């Protein structure tokens, strides 16, 4: 299989879906002539024209609302946010309109929109540009959330998200855009709500999503090489729907769990997973569930200090050693 970047995988997914379905359009700030802030839409405007790739004003409330309205009429918009931090400007549109319309209309109206963009720290852009709001979005029934960790997952999940008849929020990571993985040339889809074991193990389960999966994999290699501990790494891929069956299966296999999460710890994704394990697999645990999250503070702007705030392989290793 060819090696392609996370960025190219997303680009290919968008192009393939534009070709497959005449109702798929891309909208957002600088997605057309400029090729997107992170070049995810590079070349698409040149290939498909300004009726399929549309630049919008700098008003997230405005263009997200436009996309939601269009989706209610049968269009399948893919909306790019420069940062998921800016979703709060469009919060009413996302939560009250996209998230509630199927329920409020008694199932008569659906909203097949995709909202995508980066949601991560680690790039020294400050507290207002470094939010990871997957927990907030997932708290709303009617909205779906996916956080791809690899190019393979990014392409498969994006194509599935575009074909979904409900709103799907795809949270990417700027630090992954340039990383490469093997991606098959033939078409494939990855169903939402299906986790993936990235590394088989027997001693402890490292459960993560997004770039934290890469952190967990690095930690697993250290645990094996330096401590003789065989860690299993479970990539959630999807936050809502959440693959609770896969979470419980790996915990029942290893009897120990470390949850790795760039989300903040208070009411974060890892808190939800910990509750799931507590409620359904408590008797299987040989030790308390451990968490490695971002420090509970606004994102640090300093390039020297921000890495301290985020999950690291060393922090994951320390938590694993505490319970193994």
Q: What name fits each language-model region?
A:
Residues 1-171, 307-308, ...:
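Thiamine diphosphate
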């Amino acid at each position: 299989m060819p090696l392609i970047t996370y960025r190219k995988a997303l680009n290919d997914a968008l192009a393939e879906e534009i070709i497959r379905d005449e109702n798929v359009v891309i909208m957002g700030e600088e997605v057309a002539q400029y090729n997107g802030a992170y070049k995810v839409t590079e070349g698409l405007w040149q290939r498909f024209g300004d009726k399929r790739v549309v630049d919008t004003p700098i008003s997230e409330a405005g263009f997200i609302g436009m996309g939601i309205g269009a989706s209610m009429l049968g269009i399948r918009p893919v909306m790019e946010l420069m940062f998921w931090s800016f979703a709060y400007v469009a919060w009413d549109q996302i939560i009250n309109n996209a998230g509630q319309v199927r329920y409020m209309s008694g199932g008569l109206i659906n909203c097949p929109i995709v909202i995508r963009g980066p949601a991560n720290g680690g790039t020294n852009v400050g507290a207002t540009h470094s939010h990871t709001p997957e927990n907030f979005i997932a708290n709303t029934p009617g909205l779906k959330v996916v956080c791809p960790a690899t190019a393979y997952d990014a392409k498969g999940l994006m194509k599935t998200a575009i074909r979904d008849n409900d709103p799907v929020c795809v949270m990417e990571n700027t630090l992954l855009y340039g990383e490469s993985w093997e991606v098959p040339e033939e078409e494939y889809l990855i169903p939402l709500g299906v986790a993936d074991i990235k590394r088989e193990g027997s001693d402890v389960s490292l459960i993560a999503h997004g770039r934290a999966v890469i952190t967990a994999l690095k930690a697993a290699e250290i645990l094996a090489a330096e401590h003789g501990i065989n860690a299993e790494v479970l990539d959630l891929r999807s936050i809502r729907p959440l693959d609770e069956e896969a979470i419980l299966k790996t915990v029942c296999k290893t009897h120990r769990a470390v949850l790795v999460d760039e989300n903040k710890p208070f009411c974060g994704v890892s808190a939800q997973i910990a509750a799931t394990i507590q409620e359904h697999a408590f008797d299987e645990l040989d030790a308390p569930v451990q968490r490695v999250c971002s420090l509970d503070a606004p994102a640090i702007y300093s390039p020297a200090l921000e890495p301290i705030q985020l999950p690291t392989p060393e922090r994951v290793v320390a938590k694993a050693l505490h319970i193994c």
